[in-house]
């Protein structure tokens, strides 16, 4: 809104109005504003949650070997993150930009889904919350909306990157002059760092492109569902999900920024995406909101984000990556989320297979994987066999959290480095 106001005032030579035309200025304003909102509003909101007794106990206090008591800690803190994202975007963003619209829809959509889950847990005293099938329906619905919008909107275009070679060596990367709709996505080790979903069905001839879009929509649905659930599982320790997501958000912000500048996109050999510069405003709001939230969520947590926050930040990461055509980099960038997902899947399937044979068996001491590292041998079921018992010693959750952050930083660096590998 302020963007449009100052754009109008610029006609009258209003001092400073021209600054709002620069993405860099609006991005810095967004990250500062979102941080202040989450830090200042957060304190008042946490006190409100306490007065209303909207609190949560430790999900499983028996797994905390350090006897850290987490009784009566407010939940639904994800509302702080959502508000701190939306306000700067509404004030500083171009609200007619299709990418900004999609990100705002994603934030509100999954924020509502997570809120319903937390509401059922807190007010209806149902620990299971919203039934799993309704969560999946909500995630699939969002993925379908995002995928179809990117397919149907005439504003969603790219300029493909092309390598110029001489004597077998790449001497320059240029971009085609024409904007085009495309099912291509960025992935390392492929020609021009691009993979076209339509290539999977090239045998269909003229129909390959249309079927390629169907594949793209299905991939979108899968990525949104997987990453939002991964972030949800990762939210099991103080500061874990917020810290990891801020690091991932920073990496996506860098990729969005270079994708919106044709020269920088050429340097990294990735496609140029006109209009994607507005995503930098959004991701700066996202990062600022998470950092401000960490002020209260770092160990020992004064507030939990709940599913209101974790489902939302996971969905934001997924949709953002899809919009900038970097969804196939998610297994690297969001490696922590992937491992959390896989650890739960392996644990459940291995347990069920053992149950059919009449004995108890598990892969890890506990799942998701972060709980494995803080579970003592004394806490294990003596009647159950475990594939992985190491480490014998346990770590404090703050140490586990910081180490997971470090792993995410390394994965973020690898994600960017892989784009320069020829």
Swiss-Prot record:
Top-level taxonomic group: Bacteria
Biological processes, Gene Ontology terms: cell division; cell wall organization; peptidoglycan biosynthetic process; regulation of cell shape
Metabolic or biological pathway: Cell wall biogenesis; peptidoglycan biosynthesis
Species the sequence originates in: Phocaeicola vulgatus (strain ATCC 8482 / DSM 1447 / JCM 5826 / CCUG 4940 / NBRC 14291 / NCTC 11154) (Bacteroides vulgatus)
InterPro entries from the UniProt entry: Glycosyl_transferase_4, PNAcMuramoyl-5peptid_Trfase, PNAcMuramoyl-5peptid_Trfase_CS
Catalysed reaction, written as an equation: UDP-N-acetyl-alpha-D-muramoyl-L-alanyl-gamma-D-glutamyl-meso-2,6-diaminopimeloyl-D-alanyl-D-alanine + di-trans,octa-cis-undecaprenyl phosphate = di-trans,octa-cis-undecaprenyl diphospho-N-acetyl-alpha-D-muramoyl-L-alanyl-D-glutamyl-meso-2,6-diaminopimeloyl-D-alanyl-D-alanine + UMP
Name of the protein this chain belongs to: Phospho-N-acetylmuramoyl-pentapeptide-transferase
Name of encoding gene: mraY
GO molecular function: metal ion binding; phospho-N-acetylmuramoyl-pentapeptide-transferase activity; UDP-N-acetylmuramoyl-L-alanyl-D-glutamyl-meso-2,6-diaminopimelyl-D-alanyl-D-alanine:undecaprenyl-phosphate transferase activity
Subcellular location: Cell inner membrane
Function: Catalyzes the initial step of the lipid cycle reactions in the biosynthesis of the cell wall peptidoglycan: transfers peptidoglycan precursor phospho-MurNAc-pentapeptide from UDP-MurNAc-pentapeptide onto the lipid carrier undecaprenyl phosphate, yielding undecaprenyl-pyrophosphoryl-MurNAc-pentapeptide, known as lipid I.
